[in-house]
């Protein structure tokens, strides 16, 4: 009987061990494969190394596959450390809502051969309710390849990889993170709706080529707030087909300012309307607030309902600039008048200093003049001593109130 009891006790302990061990193994499986509502995926538990040298692409992609395949709220954790990754494709639709928590640094590979089909670095496609947040960096490591950029010499140049590209993403948020030294654009949104970009930092040297901060096209309901951008091209650029954009509390500089355009380069571009830029500061930028359309425009489109208010210029060149004969690097294919119509544009309470005598330049065309331009309390003065503050206004129609007398175009 004692032997039997001992045998039964041993059998019971063996079964208990197997159950516990099985639960542990099952728990490990849940970490790697989403099942049930909610989940968290730490890339280091999937094989990623934070030493800045080991390729962690596979681990990050595995984390995405698991999170996107799970229901409920799913989180991908990028912990502290430096994680070298190649091209990442985060494709939806997802079963649940995915948050990418960036506490560490993602480093883009500098090996351009790893970006297939002229691809981007991090490309997110057809994902709703996506959140990218944290205090970490998305480092494009652009200095290693900027010398390969030929876009200042060729009209149809081969572009380098953009850092963060979101296509067909709705109800998304990017907050807190820093986008650093992109090879080309830092952030690009295409056909996105209802996106919030807040408390983001975007930084690259002022002479880095085509490193636009945030670009958008064919998108609507975009809000950018409390964001600091200093880059080598436009801090923010609003492309064709975009509407209902609110930009507030943005500090820009260095860079080429906050721009609508360029417009008209390609056929079948759509209108731009309902753009509001408010409570922003531009520091030593090449342009301030700007609308630009190609002089050899291939599209007929309209820019309307544009409102700039409470904008402070700190020694920025060309603070207010509408350019309907835009031709970067003099590489346009033909001369001609832009087919882009600009109307109903308001500049209200624009103050500060300009590093160029031309504080206001409205360069519109005789064939398609700019109309409904309102200049209300525009008081920007030239900071130099070798000339006077002035405005150049060509083929523009509108009204002026409370402006520096030298800037009263109408």
From Swiss-Prot:
Catalysis: reaction(s): [(1->4)-alpha-D-galacturonosyl](n) + H2O = alpha-D-galacturonate + [(1->4)-alpha-D-galacturonosyl](n-1)
Entry coiled-coil feature ranges: none
Name the record gives this protein: Exopolygalacturonase
EC numbers for this chain: 3.2.1.67
PANTHER family: PTHR31375
Pfam families per record: Glyco_hydro_28 (PF00295)
Molecular function in Gene Ontology: galacturan 1,4-alpha-galacturonidase activity; polygalacturonase activity
Tissue occurrence: Pollen.
GO cellular component: extracellular region
Family: Belongs to the glycosyl hydrolase 28 family.
Keywords for this protein: Cell wall, Cell wall biogenesis/degradation, Disulfide bond, Glycoprotein, Glycosidase, Hydrolase, Repeat, Secreted, Signal
Cited function: May function in depolymerizing pectin during pollen development, germination, and tube growth. Acts as an exo-polygalacturonase.
SMART domains xref list: PbH1 (SM00710)
GO annotation, biological process: carbohydrate metabolic process; cell wall organization
InterPro entries: Glyco_hydro_28, PbH1, Pectin_lyas_fold, Pectin_lyase_fold/virulence
């Amino acid at each position: 009987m004692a032997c039997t009891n001992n045998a039964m006790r041993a059998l019971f302990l063996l079964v208990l061990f197997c159950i516990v061990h099985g639960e542990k193994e099952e728990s490990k499986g849940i970490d790697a494969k989403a099942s049930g509502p909610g989940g968290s995926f730490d890339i280091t538990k999937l094989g990623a190394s934070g030493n800045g040298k080991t390729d962690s692409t596979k681990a990050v992609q595995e984390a995405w596959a698991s999170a996107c395949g799970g229901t409920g709220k799913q989180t991908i954790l990028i912990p502290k450390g430096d994680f070298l990754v190649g091209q990442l494709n985060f494709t939806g639709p997802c079963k649940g809502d995915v948050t990418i928590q960036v506490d560490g640094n993602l480093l883009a590979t500098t090996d351009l051969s790893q970006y297939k089909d002229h691809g981007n670095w991090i490309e997110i496609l057809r994902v709703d309710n996506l959140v990218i947040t944290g205090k970490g960096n998305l480092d494009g490591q652009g200095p290693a390849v900027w010398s390969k950029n030929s876009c200042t010499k060729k009209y149809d140049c081969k572009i380098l990889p953009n850092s963060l590209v979101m296509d067909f993403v709705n109800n998304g948020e990017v907050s807190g993170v820093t986008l650093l030294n992109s090879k080309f654009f830092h952030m690009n949104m295409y056909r996105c709706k209802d996106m919030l970009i807040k408390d983001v930092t975007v930084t690259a040297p002022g002479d880095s080529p085509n490193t636009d901060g945030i670009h958008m096209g064919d998108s609507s309901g975009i809000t950018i707030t409390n964001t600091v951008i200093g880059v080598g091209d436009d801090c923010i650029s609003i492309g064709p087909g975009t509407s209902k954009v609110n930009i507030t509390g943005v500090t820009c500089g260095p860079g080429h300012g906050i721009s609508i355009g360029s417009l008209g380069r390609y056929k079948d571009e759509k209108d731009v309307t309902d753009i509001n830029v408010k409570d922003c500061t531009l520091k030593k930028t090449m342009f301030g607030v700007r609308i630009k359309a190609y002089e050899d425009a291939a599209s007929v489109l309209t820019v309307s309902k544009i409102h700039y208010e409470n904008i402070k210029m700190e020694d920025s060149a060309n603070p207010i600039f509408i350019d309907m004969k835009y031709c970067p690097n003099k590489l346009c294919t033909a001369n001609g008048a832009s087919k882009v119509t600009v109307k109903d544009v308001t500049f209200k309470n624009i103050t500060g200093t300009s590093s160029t005598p031309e504080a206001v330049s409205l360069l519109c065309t005789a064939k398609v003049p700019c109309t409904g331009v309102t200049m209300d309390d525009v008081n920007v003065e030239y900071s130099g001593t070798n000339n006077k503050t002035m405005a150049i206004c060509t083929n523009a129609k509108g009204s002026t109130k409370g402006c520096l007398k030298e800037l009263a175009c109408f």
